[in-house]
Amino acid sequence: MKKIAQGIVRLRKLILTVAILLLIPSAIGAVATRINYDILTYLPQDLDSMIGEVVLEDDFHLASTGMITVEGLPTNELIAMKKDIEAVPGVTQTFWLSDVIDPSIPTEMLPADIQQFMFGKNDSTMMIVRFDGPSASDETMDAVAQIKKVLRKDCFFGGMSVILQDTKALINQEMPFYILCAVGASLVVLFLSLESTVTPLLFMLGLLFPIAYNFGTNIFLGQISYITEALATVLQLGVTMDFSIFLLHRYQEEKELRSNNEEAMISAICKTMTSISASSLTTIAGFLALCAMRLTLGRDIGIVMAKGVALGVVCTVVVLPALILTFDRQVEQYKHRTVIPRLTKLSYFVSGHAKTIVAIFLVLLVPFAIAQQKTEVYYTLFDSLPQDLTGIVGTNKLGEDFGMTTSHFILVHDDLTASQVSDLCDELDEVDGITQVVSLDSITGPGFDTELLPDSVMEILQSGGYKLILANSSYKTGTDAINNQLTEMNDCIKAVDPAGVITGEGAMTKDLIEVADVDFAHVNVWSILAVLLIITLSFKSISIPVLLVASIEAAIAINMGIPYFTGTQLPFIASIVIGTIQLGATVDYSILMTTRYHEERAFGRTPKQAAQQTLEHCSQSILTSGLTFFAATVGVAAISKMELLQSICLLISRGALISMAVILIVLPAALMLTDGLIRRTTLHWLVPETTEKSEKE
């Protein structure tokens, strides 16, 4: 490692040049990486709802649709608007009454099913827009944006495709502010905690490289989710800031011991790499545990963040030293007093009251651990969006005027007879919460020659060997009521056609709930096991990994239990990923604390003295790192209009503070009290002479 460090210091100008040049392909890769705004596409492809979604898309071209509620618009204007919409690139068809019969025929003369389906309250009628591509495709997004401009007054545009386009527009609008807020808040903490005014700017400049490289290399993944895109910069900034702080502190210590700055930096690089190798590996392992999720959104977040941490480590020991040495004179020239102190008084208090602190903590932990299991989550991510968005307003309007709170798409094989389909529709109509059931056979009636219907109608109701049945529900997606409804409907369908499936937002969300519940358990287990293994190998200990992981898991339990007491519902994805993120991001603090405690014991200090010295000397680094992580994420939580991102960032920021408090107050006390157990379960913890000396003292 020393030869590598010498090469880094010697070739620092070349390194900076190459690092800057690499920003160019990174920018190209970042721009070319597609962003996916549809969370439901991350469901396992073998689920019935996803199989049905493929059939809807490939055979019926209905996987991406939009519904327009039109109130009080004269027929001639409505038909003119229909033609304008059909002219938009990316639109396959705009379906309305005029595609079936002459719109001048009085509505009273129409079949009851058509009346109920096409006409609603408030003198409203409905148009269905079919798009060429999937809901989250760029073509569909562009088409939705164009249609919004074409719509007349008192037209309400709803459906999945519209909401996804709204999400994209909102993210693109807010993303620059997320980054500015995270960087600005982090700089404030760094200016207050670091002596040099220039150092925080160097840190941010140094983090620009791994963040840019991370986004640029996402091109090899093909696409990333909008959640990953929104969180990656903030998380990478907060998580990898530790490494920069550790390098700086090591460099400052080595400058006092070495004859010149270059020798000091070589030594600092070697010692930093040694100290951050375990912590970075645990962080990477924590994020990679998300890959155990069947919901592949976890793999998306996990790979991007693990890659970001790895790039952060490389840039910390390669690019940042070159920056610090280049601007070393300016760093020394512009200095000020720091605000964040060493916690000397607290260190004596903790070491003097270790048993009391641990006992109180364990008692306080119990209600939070119980509350964590009872915290409510929601799965309808559209509820996390501002309710004044075009797609949300339009979708709510469909529920008000047509009773289409949720629409189920049922696919059965076309070899079922008209009477079988009709009987099935009657059964489905009897299910609680179903407001209407529409199929080709229920509209035409028995004996009707379907060849008389226009192709545009047939394509919607029968295609690719399947018949489509549309069932509208008054129940909201993601609720127990609609999940029970779907189970009852599925029983009816399987009795007639064992290969029949239900798809649509309601069915996919039900599958999402079932998958997420399993994922939650898997992710927690894998992340804990991975971190335990790495800490075990690093410290060659059985007890230390359990102690450190237990400390962070206790902090996570407190963090996840608080929403129960405040009556706050969490988005399901937050409940799955927050434990892994908090464990991976803050286990560094516990490793730093334990490493220092080991050093103090090796110097011959008693457990009490070692705990006091450890807390005093580690407090500034942990406070700086923890407060920076808190500032970066709480700023985003404060400004985001998306409740999903707001909730995740708030949990992360609060988790950083709780983990920081537990590591600073509880862990030193726990290390001190379990010192005997640690010695018996750790290889080469203390040499015999040191142990005897300590025990005599």
What annotation goes with each model-predicted range?
Residues 1-35, 41, 91, 112, ...:
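Membrane-embedded transmembrane helical bundles of large multi-pass transporters/channels
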